[in-house]
Amino acid sequence: MRLNTLSPANGARHSRKRLGRGIGSGFGKTSGRGHKGQKSRSGSSIRRGFEGGQMPLYRRLPKFGFNSRKKNITTEVRLSDLSNLSTNIIDLNVLKQENIIKKNIKYAKIILSGKLTVPLIIRGLLVSKGARSEIENTGGKVEG
């Protein structure tokens, strides 16, 4: 067997249907579009979700939820990230300077993930319950 002798199996390939080529073809005259109506016209397409003038489903159902603009300026910080810092007093500006969070972040929350090895003083940051207890157990404290 050679690549130049390969051919598709019988019936595997179909020739495309030629539209508008006589009654005997099965697709003559109206070319499979039926008679009249919007879908029979050239250049016509019915928009997605259109239900023939009936109020469409996406407008019958109520709106819900919203996208909070705060989510783009809020982030989480792991305890394990804080133990590698050069300073022991940590606030939002320190996290930005050390490139732990991006410059546009306005709110950061410290979460319990990993172990804390050095005592830290946290100022002006949100802290989860688990992270708070871990910070206090290592001799640090949470202010504000």
Swiss-Prot record:
<dbReference type="InterPro" id="IPR021131">
    <property type="entry name" value="Ribosomal_uL15/eL18"/>
</dbReference>
<dbReference type="GO" id="GO:0019843">
    <property type="term" value="F:rRNA binding"/>
</dbReference>
<comment type="subunit">
    <text>Part of the 50S ribosomal subunit.</text>
</comment>
<keyword id="KW-0687">Ribonucleoprotein</keyword>
<dbReference type="Pfam" id="PF00828">
    <property type="entry name" value="Ribosomal_L27A"/>
</dbReference>
<comment type="similarity">
    <text>Belongs to the universal ribosomal protein uL15 family.</text>
</comment>
<dbReference type="GO" id="GO:0006412">
    <property type="term" value="P:translation"/>
</dbReference>
<dbReference type="InterPro" id="IPR036227">
    <property type="entry name" value="Ribosomal_uL15/eL18_sf"/>
</dbReference>
<protein>
    <recommendedName>
        <fullName>Large ribosomal subunit protein uL15</fullName>
    </recommendedName>
</protein>
<comment type="function">
    <text>Binds to the 23S rRNA.</text>
</comment>
<dbReference type="GO" id="GO:0003735">
    <property type="term" value="F:structural constituent of ribosome"/>
</dbReference>
<keyword id="KW-0699">rRNA-binding</keyword>
<feature type="compositionally biased region" description="Gly residues">
    <location>
        <begin position="21"/>
        <end position="31"/>
    </location>
</feature>
<keyword id="KW-0689">Ribosomal protein</keyword>
<dbReference type="GO" id="GO:0022625">
    <property type="term" value="C:cytosolic large ribosomal subunit"/>
</dbReference>
<dbReference type="InterPro" id="IPR030878">
    <property type="entry name" value="Ribosomal_uL15"/>
</dbReference>
<dbReference type="InterPro" id="IPR001196">
    <property type="entry name" value="Ribosomal_uL15_CS"/>
</dbReference>
<keyword id="KW-0694">RNA-binding</keyword>
<dbReference type="InterPro" id="IPR005749">
    <property type="entry name" value="Ribosomal_uL15_bac-type"/>
</dbReference>
<feature type="region of interest" description="Disordered">
    <location>
        <begin position="1"/>
        <end position="52"/>
    </location>
</feature>
